[in-house]
């Protein structure tokens, strides 16, 4: 951190100012976060022990669920605890740590969604060569690449923010640490830093979104050569992917691809993609996937009847 900084602690304004509303939010968001951890954790457990789900598609799905848990846990626990606190504080080092892991897991999730789209493309457009192309080694490399991409992205974000001097005030108009609200507290011009963040976050999201849209267009065009049953199964899988893409990329593009003025709308949108969306993803994937639902039923059946094989 720059030597001119004398701010060591930051204060969040929070999502709402009314204590009664904050109490209601606590009652709502605590079960949502617990459902996120349990739902995504159940997918990870089911895929890891179910032989019927031993395919690249479900391997990627379990990795995505693991990232969802990590991504939501970066923000949600402190946010929920702060709903009951009169003064919501975080150290400057804790703020930077939160920014790092928030962007790390966020970009890792984006890249995993792109990987899953590629897997879907190969499965539908090149089914005869699927096992040769999507090998176990490639699966591990793609997942490792997603995590590495998230790490590199976060390092850039931290290098941008760590050079800024913070002389006061120390109140962040948000309920968690992110770059744009923190820029408002810097006692120097942050135009260039804002441009770097726009290029690193916003344009990255848009570029990834365009890749995803292009891949789904190619998939839909190729579905004309499939049977009615094959089209139905492929469309069901694609519908789940597309729904997750819209839920994740919509808010991200809204936040990072427009000038910042006030953060009232930003905070409401941020709640959606930091708390709500991670809970919805396992529901979206399991409700439209018969194999996952059957595997989960078998898992529970074994727990209830441990003597049965």
From Swiss-Prot:
Glycans are attached at residue 6. It is found in: Cell membrane. Residues 1-23, 78-98, 157-193, 257-267 are extracellular. Residues 48-55, 119-137, 218-233, 288-309 are cytoplasmic. It comes from the Eukaryota. GO terms for molecular function: G protein-coupled receptor activity; olfactory receptor activity. The chain crosses the membrane at residues 24-47, 56-77, 99-118, 138-156, 194-217, 234-256, 268-287. SUPFAM superfamilies: Family A G protein-coupled receptor-like (SSF81321). PROSITE patterns: G_PROTEIN_RECEP_F1_2. Gene3D superfamilies: Rhodopsin 7-helix transmembrane proteins. Keywords: Cell membrane, Disulfide bond, G-protein coupled receptor, Glycoprotein, Membrane, Olfaction, Receptor, Sensory transduction, Transducer, Transmembrane, Transmembrane helix. InterPro entries: GPCR_Rhodpsn, GPCR_Rhodpsn_7TM, Olfact_rcpt, Olfactory_Receptors. One of its GO terms (cellular component) is plasma membrane. It is a multi-pass membrane protein. Disulfide bonds join 95-187. Odorant receptor. Belongs to the G-protein coupled receptor 1 family. PANTHER family: OLFACTORY RECEPTOR. This is Olfactory receptor 4B1. It comes from Homo sapiens (Human). The gene is OR4B1.
């Amino acid at each position: 951190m720059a030597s001119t900084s004398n701010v060591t602690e930051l204060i969040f304004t929070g999502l709402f100012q009314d204590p009664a509303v904050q109490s209601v939010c606590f009652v709502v968001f605590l079960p949502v976060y617990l459902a996120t951890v349990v739902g995504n954790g159940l997918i990870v457990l089911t895929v890891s022990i179910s032989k019927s789900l031993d395919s690249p598609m479900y391997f990627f799905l379990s990795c995505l669920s693991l990232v969802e848990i990590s991504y939501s846990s970066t923000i949600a626990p402190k946010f929920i605890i702060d709903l009951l606190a009169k003064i919501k504080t975080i150290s400057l080092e804790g703020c930077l740590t939160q920014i790092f892991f928030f962007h790390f897991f966020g970009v890792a999730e984006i890249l995993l969604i792109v990987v899953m789209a590629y897997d879907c493309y190969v499965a539908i457009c090149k089914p005869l060569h699927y096992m040769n192309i999507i090998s176990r080694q490639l699966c591990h490399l793609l997942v490792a690449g997603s995590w590495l991409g998230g790490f590199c992205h976060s390092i850039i974000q931290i290098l941008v923010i760590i050079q800024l001097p913070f002389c006061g005030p120390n109140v962040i108009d948000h309920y968690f640490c992110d770059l744009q609200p923190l820029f408002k507290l810097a006692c120097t011009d942050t135009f260039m830093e804002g441009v770097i963040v726009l290029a690193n976050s916003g344009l990255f999201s848009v570029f990834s979104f365009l890749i995803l849209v292009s891949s789904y267009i190619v998939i839909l065009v190729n579905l004309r050569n499939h049977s009615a049953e094959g089209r139905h199964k492929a469309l069901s899988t694609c519908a789940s992917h597309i729904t997750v893409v819209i839920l994740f990329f919509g808010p991200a593009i809204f936040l990072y691809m427009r000038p910042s003025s006030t953060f009232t709308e930003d905070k409401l949108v941020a709640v959606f993609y930091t708390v709500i969306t991670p809970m919805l993803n396992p529901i979206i994937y399991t409700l439209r996937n018969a194999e996952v639902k059957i595997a989960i039923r078998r898992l529970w059946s074994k727990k209830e009847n441990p003597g049965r094989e």
